């Protein structure tokens, strides 16, 4: 690993490497490790000592950095602390998260054995950006086929998630044995002085659940009578045929067992990100949050 000012692990060569736990060197003493036991951020401490909340923060980080839909990772299957998480085998990850299990397992192994404190890991705006090599193509192909096939109602093109998405994060979905590489100084200079981003129009065939819901509202002629606006100006909408929406989403994601209960559970993960909100006291009624884009009438 190439990192500016990063530490390395001390491994006792007299023991079997597979049964060792990493020990943090003096270079990690500057991190506020103790705060991790009392609500610190997940990347500040070793995964072994994560709380249940920090485990969920880690899962949410993987969703955000890799631009995955919230339904890709079943959070309810990971209601465990870091000690339990680190003891889980690859088979247990696969049982809990399906095709995403191997990706989660690989990332956790990387953090366990190559972990850095946040001061070393997350300096994308001031220091070297760390990238990972491409995930095993066989894993990627399975992931793509099962999670990113578009329904024919949203176009005939099979739009698969580009494998580069998984390499976009600073420390992302890696398999053990892959070494991160550092960007060149020219790339670093561009990162320090980024160009002004261009506003993009929303994708009419959004891959995320909230975009899928938004697109039904914006194109009622394609799927009439499923969802309607309660107050367009405030972004409030109601499900009219909740199970039909769930089945359509399941068809889009190639998941025949999708129900509204599962769909609504996935929607909850957008609350923290302020993309969706639940309207209190009103069944099947939701509201777009401040971070949702593309639903307003005057929005380009």
Swiss-Prot record:
Query: Where is the DNA-binding region?
Result: 207-289
Q: What is this protein called?
A: ETS homologous factor
Family, as annotated: Belongs to the ETS family.
Q: What is its main location?
A: nucleus
Gene encoding this chain?
Answer: EHF
Which Gene Ontology cellular component terms are annotated?
A: nucleus
Q: What is known of its domains?
A: The PNT domain acts as a transcriptional activator.
Q: Keyword set for this entry?
A: DNA-binding, Nucleus, Transcription, Transcription regulation
Q: Where is the composition biased (Basic and acidic residues)?
A: 185-195
Output the Pfam families linked to this UniProt entry: Ets (PF00178), SAM_PNT (PF02198)
Which GO BP terms apply?
cell differentiation; regulation of transcription by RNA polymerase II
One GO MF term attached to the UniProt entry: sequence-specific DNA binding
Q: Where in the cell is it found?
A: Nucleus
User: Which stretches make up the PNT domain?
Assistant: 29-115
Q: Where is this region: Disordered?
A: 179-204
Tell me, what does this protein do in biology? Transcriptional activator that may play a role in regulating epithelial cell differentiation and proliferation. May act as a repressor for a specific subset of ETS/AP-1-responsive genes, and as a modulator of the nuclear response to mitogen-activated protein kinase signaling cascades. Binds to DNA sequences containing the consensus nucleotide core sequence GGAA. Involved in regulation of TNFRSF10B/DR5 expression through Ets-binding sequences on the TNFRSF10B/DR5 promoter.
């Amino acid at each position: 690993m190439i990192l500016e000012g990063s530490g390395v692990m001390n491994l006792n060569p007299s023991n079997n490497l597979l049964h060792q736990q990493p020990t943090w060197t003096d270079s990690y003493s500057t991190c506020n490790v103790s705060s991790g036991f009392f609500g610190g951020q997940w990347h500040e401490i070793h995964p072994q000592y994560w709380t249940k909340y920090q485990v969920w923060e880690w899962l949410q980080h993987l969703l955000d950095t890799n631009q995955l839909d919230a339904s890709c990772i079943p959070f309810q299957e990971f209601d465990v602390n870091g000690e339990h998480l680190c003891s889980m085998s690859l088979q247990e990850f696969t049982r809990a998260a399906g095709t995403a299990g191997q990706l989660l397992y690989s990332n956790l192994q990387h953090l366990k054995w190559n972990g850095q404190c946040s001061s070393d890991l997350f300096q994308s705006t001031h220091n070297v950006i760390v990238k990972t090599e491409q995930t095993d193509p066989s894993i990627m192909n399975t992931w793509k086929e099962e999670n990113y096939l578009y329904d024919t109602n949203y176009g005939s093109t099979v739009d698969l998630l580009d494998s580069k998405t998984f390499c976009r994060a600073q420390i992302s979905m890696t398999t053990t044995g892959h070494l991160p590489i550092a960007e060149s100084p020219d790339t670093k200079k561009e990162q320090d002085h980024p160009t002004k981003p261009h506003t993009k129009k929303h994708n009419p065939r959004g891959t995320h659940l909230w975009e899928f819901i938004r697109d039904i509202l914006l194109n009622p002629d394609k799927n009439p009578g499923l969802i309607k606006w309660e107050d367009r100006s405030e972004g409030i909408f109601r499900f009219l045929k909740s199970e039909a929406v769930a089945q359509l989403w399941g068809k889009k994601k190639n998941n025949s067992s999708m129900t509204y209960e599962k769909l609504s559970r996935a929607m909850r993960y957008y609350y923290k990100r302020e993309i969706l909100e639940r309207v209190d006291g009103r069944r099947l009624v939701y509201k777009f949050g401040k971070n949702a884009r593309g639903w307003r009438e005057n929005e380009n």
